[in-house]
Amino acid sequence: MIDYERSNTTKNINTHHHNPPPSSSSSDLLPDGNGTAVTQKRKRRPAGTPDPEAEVVSLSPRTLLESDRYVCEICNQGFQRDQNLQMHRRRHKVPWKLLKRETNEEVRKRVYVCPEPTCLHHNPCHALGDLVGIKKHFRRKHSNHKQWICERCSKGYAVQSDYKAHLKTCGTRGHSCDCGRVFSRVESFIEHQDTCTVRRSQPSNHRLHEQQQHTTNATQTASTAENNENGDLSIGPILPGHPLQRRQSPPSEQQPSTLLYPFVTNGSIELQLLPSRNCADETSLSLSIGTMDQKTMSEVEKKSYEKGETSLEREEARRETKRQIEIAELEFAEAKRIRQHARAELHKAHLFREEASRRISATMMQITCHNCKQHFQAPAALVPPPPQTHCTDESTSLAVSYMSSATTEGEKASDRASS
């Protein structure tokens, strides 16, 4: 394992605490009113108050910046945690006696202090109880080497876990406050909301905005009811026991009919919507709007129809192109097949030619007379090679003709020599 620098002397945190907290490893017995002993429940120690009996370890900055703190003594593979190293050792299948620690050694808990003198965690009273924690703290606060850089926002991180957490929220708004600040961590966002001044002044403004919005909605509802289809409704408070009544107006009257309700005399608010005086103007306006809507709809339908035709033409052209590509691929495959067949025929013709020449040479070697052999070698060289389409029978007949001529000439030469 890699050696690490400890403090010159093993410090006891009891000397730095005025009132040391009780140890979490021991359970105190408190007497109750009857004198019986009651076991005190163990409480979790708050952050920054380590165990007073723990061993204080001070590591050098070089050791804290190392990526692999624990190294296997068998294969020299490094790990960041001791638990990972112990799990790795089991894979080597080493006998348990070699891995078992000596029972005489007393295992003490260790706490780690920051080597930076100006840091809060340099004091043993605020030491960190985890090696990974002190390494992350030193890299975040006291190291300028930011190894992991975000490709989107070019923000650098010295700790890989912080970089991975940033990647999950990078490119999004994250947790945004009303003051404009954006937080990637929920904890930081909650802490900021507790101290944000903009959020405190928001409820009163929000209530005022709700009141204004409620008034606006009521006004819009009244104006919408005035522009209804009939234009002759008069809405008032309906009292129980009084049915709705409609007054029938003669045809000569131009005013539209209204609904009559008994009015309330106790001073309550009455919402009464009367028809507008310019009823003819409203009718003409609605007709003109309807005409414009029809024109707009016709234009939209025409454009959509043109777009549909264009899309159909494009689809048809795409299909035709695809069909032509398939035909070209088939023709190319057929051409490749014809070429391979032609190559095979040419190879067969070459083989036939070589076989014929070999047989002719073998026949000429059987002639015993040296003069005749030289005499017939020259005409054989001048004979053109057989065409590629000749078969084996033609080459054989040619070789037989050469043999017969050679035999005849040999007999004539022997007769001359004997005479």
Curated annotation (Swiss-Prot):
A molecular function GO annotation: transcription cis-regulatory region binding
Species this protein is from: Arabidopsis thaliana
Induction per the UniProt record: Not regulated by auxin.
Biological function: Transcription factor regulating starch metabolism by binding directly to the promoter of QQS. The IDD14beta isoform attenuates the transcription factor activity by competitively forming heterodimers with reduced DNA-binding capacity. Regulates lateral organ morphogenesis and gravitropic responses. Has a redundant role with IDD16 in directing leaf and floral organ morphogenesis. Involved in the establishment of auxin gradients through the regulation of auxin biosynthesis and transport.
Predominant localisation class: nucleus
Source lineage: Eukaryota, Viridiplantae, Streptophyta, Embryophyta, Tracheophyta
A GO cellular component annotation in the UniProt record: nucleus
Subunit comment: Homo- and heterodimer of IDD14alpha and IDD14beta.
UniProt keyword annotations, A-Z: Coiled coil, DNA-binding, Metal-binding, Nucleus, Repeat, Transcription, Transcription regulation, Zinc, Zinc-finger
Keyword Phosphoprotein appears in the UniProt entry: no
Zn finger spans (CCHC-type): 175-198
Stated name of the protein: Protein indeterminate-domain 14
GO biological process, one term: regulation of auxin polar transport
Free-text comment on this protein's domains from its UniProt entry: The coiled-coil domain (311-350) is involved in dimerization.
Subcellular location: Nucleus
Positions contributing to Zn(2+) 2 binding: 177, 179, 192, 196
Zinc finger (C2H2-type): 70-92, 112-142, 148-175
SUPFAM superfamilies per record: beta-beta-alpha zinc fingers
Null mutant phenotype: No visible phenotype. Accelerated growth and slightly early flowering.
Positions of region (SHR-binding): 185-197
Region Disordered, annotated ranges: 1-58, 200-259, 298-318
Source organism superkingdom: Eukaryota
Tissue spec: Expressed in cotyledons and the vasculature of reosette leaves. Weak expression in hypocotyls and floral organs, but not detected in roots and inflorescence stems.
Record Gene3D superfamilies: Classic Zinc Finger (3.30.160.60)
Chain intervals with Low complexity compositional bias: 213-230, 246-259
Residues binding Zn(2+) 1, per UniProt: 150, 153, 166, 170
Recorded coiled-coil stretches: 313-349
